[in-house]
């Protein structure tokens, strides 16, 4: 457990709740004290959905501490079963309630006898794993539970579909542009003649999980969630998977070729033919995606050699690093991730594409690195956006955790060919470019001497003495800039070159007159 005012990945129970609330007709019960139950508020605020968050908090209070939790937890499970009639109820403790060392599995077993829903306890060590690892583990646990159940009941049909099909695994609630990415992946697979078998967990039903083995292969767009499930399905049912994230032209090509390889394993026998996607890749790269020609344009060449820092989850940070270095000629001074559990893979991916690698979940270390490097732009999470504002460095957000502005209503995927256009726009708009650079250097803004920047003065003919600077600093930040501009404007109009406290008050009086 760690006390911090900013965490890149939250506690384990948040990951479990994200997976549970992504499925349709699944209810989660969180065994937690007040304070750990913020998930409902967070999801309701951020996700653009009309449905209520299907999570109930079974609060650990003084009565529970005195008598134990069994009665309360079992009552909550039975009540929710009666009210909501869910297919599955997932019970999860939090790292705080885990301190009580109660046998929650026993509570689940007892409740299961009296309810119609399936009930499982999230099999997660809340002290050892973070939000993303817990989400990955919970998804695998739910998939395993329902496939084992179907096998026991003799309902498991392992015959594959007549036409090429895929499962998309790892799209879930509160993910970074996940809904948009999912639409783009569906479009990509449709173009390749591949049917969607299942998308899990987002929008899926647990009763349909028994159909997962019917697909020809599994597509895992994000390493953080879905990989454990794919490995389990490969081991148990021999299902191949593709885990190359189709983000950026080069990786989209690699992903499509990997899909072609997986599909041709079966088409050779079932359809007596082999599929070739090279023409599709060529058409999309040259004529559909704007990013390929944009990266060769004079606009993009202005970015060549500019420094950038990239930080985020392993999937997005590694892909973004390769896009900047390979496709846009931007120098990535530092690439980093907060996914310490996936450090080895991340280092392998970005090796040779950046000057240094940073593996940390400490935001102060990231801030210090950015301040030391002084890049032209940052590509990171919401925290890097805050750091950028403090250091006056533009920041493009490319990874969770994010705030409301990165849950857009419009269509903004980061994956697939449309995703390449979005990324090109984001990169280009994040840098201060061309003539803008010169104007800022010469005038501190546009071509007028009347513009005042954040520094104390843009002109050498105006100087603030120590008393006036001290007085200015006493003024609250949200109006300080306005007062400074008004004072300097008054000084220029009256031919004053040295600003004193008296000048400040004279400017105030003149403005109020």
Curated annotation (Swiss-Prot):
- Cite the EC number: 1.3.7.7
Kindly give the InterPro entries that the UniProt entry links to this protein. Answer: ChlB/BchB/BchZ (IPR050152), LI-POR_suB-like_C (IPR013580), Nase/OxRdtase_comp1 (IPR000510), P-CP_red_C (IPR042298), Protochl_reductB (IPR005969), Protochlorophyllide_Rdtase (IPR016209)
Q: Which reaction does it catalyse?
A: chlorophyllide a + oxidized 2[4Fe-4S]-[ferredoxin] + 2 ADP + 2 phosphate = protochlorophyllide a + reduced 2[4Fe-4S]-[ferredoxin] + 2 ATP + 2 H2O
Amino-acid positions noted as binding substrate in the UniProt annotation, renumbered to this chain: 434-435
Associated pathway: Porphyrin-containing compound metabolism; chlorophyll biosynthesis (light-independent)
Q: How is the cofactor bound?
A: Binds 1 [4Fe-4S] cluster per heterodimer. The cluster is bound at the heterodimer interface by residues from both subunits.
Say yes or no: keyword Magnesium present: no
Show the GO MF annotations: 4 iron, 4 sulfur cluster binding; ATP binding; metal ion binding; oxidoreductase activity, acting on iron-sulfur proteins as donors; oxidoreductase activity, acting on the CH-CH group of donors, iron-sulfur protein as acceptor
Active-site residue numbers: 299 (proton donor)
Tell me which cofactor or cofactors this protein depends on.
[4Fe-4S] cluster
Q: What GO biological process terms does the UniProt entry carry, in alphabetical order?
A: light-independent chlorophyll biosynthetic process; photosynthesis, dark reaction
- Quote the Pfam families the UniProt record gives: Oxidored_nitro, PCP_red
GO CC, sorted alphabetically, is:
chloroplast
Location(s) in or outside the cell:
Plastid, Chloroplast
List positions binding [4Fe-4S] cluster: 36
Q: Which SUPFAM superfamilies match?
A: Helical backbone' metal receptor
Which controlled-vocabulary keywords does the entry list? 4Fe-4S, ATP-binding, Chlorophyll biosynthesis, Chloroplast, Iron, Iron-sulfur, Metal-binding, Nucleotide-binding, Oxidoreductase, Photosynthesis, Plastid
Q: Could you give the subunit structure recorded for this chain?
A: Protochlorophyllide reductase is composed of three subunits; ChlL, ChlN and ChlB. Forms a heterotetramer of two ChlB and two ChlN subunits.
Q: What does this protein do?
A: Component of the dark-operative protochlorophyllide reductase (DPOR) that uses Mg-ATP and reduced ferredoxin to reduce ring D of protochlorophyllide (Pchlide) to form chlorophyllide a (Chlide). This reaction is light-independent. The NB-protein (ChlN-ChlB) is the catalytic component of the complex.
HAMAP family (alphabetical): ChlB_BchB (MF_00353)
Query: What's the family?
Result: Belongs to the ChlB/BchB/BchZ family.
What this protein is called in its record is Light-independent protochlorophyllide reductase subunit B
What organism is the protein native to? Anthoceros angustus (Hornwort)
Q: Please spell out the taxonomic lineage of the organism that makes this protein.
A: Eukaryota, Viridiplantae, Streptophyta, Embryophyta, Anthocerotophyta
Please name the gene that encodes this protein: chlB
